Regions:
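Helix-rich catalytic cores of soluble enzyme domains
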Residues: 1-109, 120-141
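Active-site or pore-adjacent capping/gating segments
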Residues: 104, 113-180
Length: 180
C-alpha cells in the first residue's frame, strides 16, 4: 500500500482488514485459525518519515493483537513483520541521496520492530551497476546488525515521548471492532 501512496492510517487499516477477512474464513475451526495466526507475516513498505514509520509498525502490532483476541485467547503471539523500503521516494537524478533514504527507512523499520528487512538498492531506479547497489544495501543491513547492535534490544523506541504520542494518534481508530 505504501508504494501506491497510501498514508500510514490507510496502510494499517488495509492490512488489518485484509487479514481479518482471512480470519473470518476460518473462525469456526479454532485449530486451523490458531495455526494461521501463528504463521501470518505482514509486509509493510517503509517511507522516509523516520518517526512516523517507527510508530506505524509499533501501532500495527498493538492493533493486530487486539484483533486476534477477538477470535481466540492466545497470549504472547509474536506479530511477524517484513519491511521493505519504498522506491517511491527514490530520486532518479541524485541516486546517492537514495543511500540516506535507504538507511533511514531501514533503521526506522528495525526500530519499529520488524523481523526481517529488505532494502532496495539505492540505484534501483537507474540503469547500470546494480551489483554495487545490492552490495551497499546488504552492507547497510550488516551495519544495523553487527555495528550498531539494533537486533540486540527488543523495543528500542519504547518510552520515547514523541514515538508514543504518534502511536496514540495512529491508534485513534483502535476502538473500531471487526466482527469475528
Amino acid at each position: 500500500y505504501c508504494n501506491g501512496g497510501a498514508n500510514v492510517d490507510t496502510q494499517i487499516a488495509c492490512a488489518i482488514a485484509h487479514a481479518n477477512e482471512y480470519l473470518n474464513l476460518f473462525k469456526n475451526d479454532l485449530i486451523i485459525l490458531e495455526k494461521i495466526i501463528q504463521k501470518t507475516e505482514f509486509t509493510f513498505g517503509i517511507g522516509t518519515s523516520y518517526f512516523l514509520e517507527i510508530a506505524k509498525l509499533r501501532s500495527f502490532r498493538s492493533l493486530w493483537s487486539t484483533i486476534i483476541t477477538q477470535y481466540i485467547s492466545i497470549e504472547n503471539i509474536e506479530t511477524k513483520i517484513h519491511a521493505i523500503n519504498s522506491n517511491l521516494y527514490y530520486s532518479n537524478k541524485d541516486m546517492y541521496n537514495n543511500l540516506l533514504r535507504a538507511t533511514t527507512s531501514g533503521m526506522s523499520a528495525v526500530l519499529g520492530g520488524c523481523h526481517s528487512l529488505s532494502l532496495l538498492p539505492f540505484n534501483s531506479n537507474s540503469l547500470g551497476n546494480e551489483e554495487f547497489g545490492q552490495r551497499i544495501s546488504k552492507n547497510i543491513q550488516l551495519l544495523f546488525q553487527e555495528e550498531s547492535y539494533l537486533n540486540q534490544v527488543k523495543d528500542t523506541s519504547k518510552g520515547s515521548y514523541y514515538v508514543e504520542n504518534l502511536i496514540s494518534i495512529i491508534n485513534k481508530f483502535k476502538n473500531l471492532s471487526f466482527d469475528p
